């Protein structure tokens, strides 16, 4: 008897469809699957891939970040495309005229964009508007903005580590002595 082949690493782990059963998302997937196949544009392939992603991999994009990214040279008059949610940012005083396409736009962000004379498209409208993604800028929110990422990395307590430890309380007696002050062993 020979040693059999290990089949545990055969499967390529990647999404081929969204996990969600949302019928409207599924319709968009149908549309962009067609466009990705029939057009030779990478834009449609990227949008399709992002439609499959989980919520944590489609972080919300704030209005301020979008304005900042759209102010960069060569992006005037282009459509900002976000496969995710656009949220409002109260720190922004004036909103420029923007043309935006997103899966969702929060109510306050929506009213502010429209008030500034901007335009909000859905992805099916974008497919009619620019089927190859011409004149668009693909944007996404900060994926590592979630608090949980602060706990990842080098173990807390090791030299040069800025990783946040999981502590039940932030009091004086919790992870504040050895390794945090020179009088208690060492400080790093």
UniProtKB/Swiss-Prot annotation:
Its main location: cytoplasm. GO terms for molecular function: RNA binding; structural constituent of ribosome. The modification Phosphothreonine is found at residue 158. It holds the Pfam family Ribosomal_L18. It is found in: Cytoplasm, Cytosol; Cytoplasm; Rough endoplasmic reticulum. GO terms for cellular component: cytosolic large ribosomal subunit; rough endoplasmic reticulum. Residues 150-188 are annotated as: Disordered. Keywords: Cytoplasm, Endoplasmic reticulum, Isopeptide bond, Phosphoprotein, Ribonucleoprotein, Ribosomal protein, Ubl conjugation. Residues 161-171, 178-188 have a biased composition (Basic residues). There is a cross-link at residues 119, 164 (Glycyl lysine isopeptide (Lys-Gly) (interchain with G-Cter in SUMO2)). One of its GO terms (biological process) is cytoplasmic translation. Gene3D superfamilies: 3.100.10.10. Disulfide bonds: none annotated. The modification Phosphoserine is found at residue 130. Component of the large ribosomal subunit. Belongs to the eukaryotic ribosomal protein eL18 family. Component of the large ribosomal subunit. The ribosome is a large ribonucleoprotein complex responsible for the synthesis of proteins in the cell. This is Large ribosomal subunit protein eL18. It comes from Bos taurus (Bovine). The gene is RPL18.
């Amino acid at each position: 008897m020979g040693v059999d082949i290990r089949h545990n690493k055969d499967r390529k782990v990647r999404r081929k469809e969204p996990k969600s059963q949302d019928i409207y998302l599924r319709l968009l997937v149908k549309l962009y699957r067609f466009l990705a196949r029939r057009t030779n544009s990478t834009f449609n392939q990227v949008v399709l891939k992002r439609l499959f992603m989980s919520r944590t991999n489609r972080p919300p994009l704030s209005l301020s970040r979008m304005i900042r990214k759209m102010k960069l040279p060569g992006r005037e008059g282009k459509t900002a495309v976000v496969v995710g949610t656009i949220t409002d940012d109260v720190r922004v005083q004036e909103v420029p005229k923007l043309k935006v396409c997103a899966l969702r736009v929060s109510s306050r962000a929506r009213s502010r964009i429209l008030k500034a004379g901007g335009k909000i498209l859905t992805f099916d409208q974008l497919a009619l508007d620019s089927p190859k993604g011409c004149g668009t800028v693909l944007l996404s929110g900060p994926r590592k903005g979630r608090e949980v990422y602060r706990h990842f990395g080098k173990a807390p307590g090791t030299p040069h580590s800025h990783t946040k430890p999981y502590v039940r309380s932030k009091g004086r007696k919790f992870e504040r002595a050895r390794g945090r002050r020179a009088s208690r062993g060492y400080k790093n």
